[in-house]
Amino acid sequence: MDRFGDISEGEVDHSFFDSDFEDTKKCESNSIFDKQNDDDFKEGINKDIKNLNLKFGVQNDNLKEKIDNDTENVNVKLGIQTKENYLTQKGNERKPKFPSKEQHVENDPIQTRSPSLLTSSRSKKLCDTTKGNKLHLPVPNRIPKIVKGEDDYYTDGEESSDDGKKYHVRSKSAKPSSNLKKNNTSKKYSKASSSSLSSSSSRSSSDCSDIGSDMQNKPDSGSSGKRVSSVTPSSPKQKCKSGRKSSAKQKAGDYNAESEDNVTDVTPASTPDSSPAQPFELSQSQNQKVKVKRQENVSRDVYEDVEALKNDSRCLKSAKRKEKHGQNFAPKSSVLDANLDRRSKQKVLHDTMDLNHLLKAFLQLDKKGPQKHHFEQPSIIPRKNYSFTREEVRQIDRENQRLLKELSRQAEKPGNKSTIPGRSLGHPPKLYHSALNRQREQQRIERENMALLKRLEAVKPTVGMKRSEQLMDYHRNISYLNPSPSVRRVRSTLGHYSPLRGASRTSSATSGLSCKTDRSVLDTSSGFLLRPKPPNIQCSNSKVLRSH
């Protein structure tokens, strides 16, 4: 009795202690009739379910809610029509058989209608239509087992009220054996637990549960006959729960059979609650990617843009001044961690500044040439360097200034350009022995030529070295040595051919003519070789001539 805590007032049905064999024959006759009607009813409902499933597969996600509403209306109408026909036949057949328990059934519909009044108007109409028929039907003898964890499972008010009323339609039958009862109940509620999880995702599953409850009217009447009632019927909530569980079991069996035969199975997903988390996770991953990209772009901009680094350095200086004045009281550990990034940025900034100064210096050297260079030294600003100590900074500045001064001195020297090619010629390339011999021979010839040129440049012309004068002196000397008529004849000829007689020997015009005549005479008359006389002979000849 602990399982059925919701049973009202703990009423007990004393018919539980009666014999079970009285109702077995009735159960068999009812089960045969129920099976015949149930087969036809199942086929019609299966076709409707297939059509609904095809419609669900074709329609878009935006039209699902409309289709759910339409299917609810269709299922309710079909359920009302089938229940009216079914209940009228069952009530007329079983009316004379069970007159003793009609009074008990009259109390049940009143209980089931009381919670249904709180639901929609549709549930009220269903209660009114099924009221007269339920008065003639028996009550199931046994209350079904309630599985834990499914007590609070409700789809909406309409379904709970409909399922509660459908549960009263089930016929009472005998109980064949305890073994069959245990097997059926265990299978029944194991399927119900699995199907309840799969059918909780959408409203279409709840509609199918309504149809499944109609399909289960006959089979459940046979199975309920196996149970012997020991307690009075439960409250409407429990009846709705049990009816829903049994309909879910029958629905799961029908869907399994259809999924094997049909290709287009459009049953809802078993875990719909996890689907909204997927786009949220995707959006989170996309946001993380965007953040990573932004961080990469920021890091690139920090290390590539020198102007941004300058601005950062100014901000750091202002922050440091605030710290000195006592505005910032951060702990030393956090300041040290922040200084690591600042030092790297400051180092890059100072390196770029030094390179810029060197480039400016070299550009000025190329433009101005040998002129004096006046380098604009950077103004010394008292600053705090985060990468080096003050002593190291001063040492680096001194070294940079020294290097700049040396470069400026080398540029100011006038003979700087002439010394550079001399260094290149001072170290000739290494040659083979044959090339060396040729080079030495060439150098020797050049030396001899230079000496001969110097000697020729040093020679000065002598006085009286003309050709005509030399010939005259020569002939005189010969005449003095060998006085003969030939010599006189030569003299006469010379005097005859000379146009200017008695002219001075020093005249240039007579000397030119005498040269030509002397050559012709000497060539024809005598074959003497004309050679220049040494100066001593000339002097002697001149003296002799003067003496004469």
From Swiss-Prot:
Alphabetized Pfam families for the sequence: Hmw_CFAP97
Sites bearing Phosphothreonine, chain numbering: 155
Transmembrane segments: none
Biased composition, class Low complexity, residue ranges: 112-121, 191-209
Keywords: Coiled coil, Phosphoprotein
Residues in the signal sequence: none
InterPro entries: Cfap97/Hemingway, Hmw/CFAP97
Name of protein: Cilia- and flagella-associated protein 97
Organism: Rattus norvegicus (Rat)
Gene name linked to the record: Cfap97
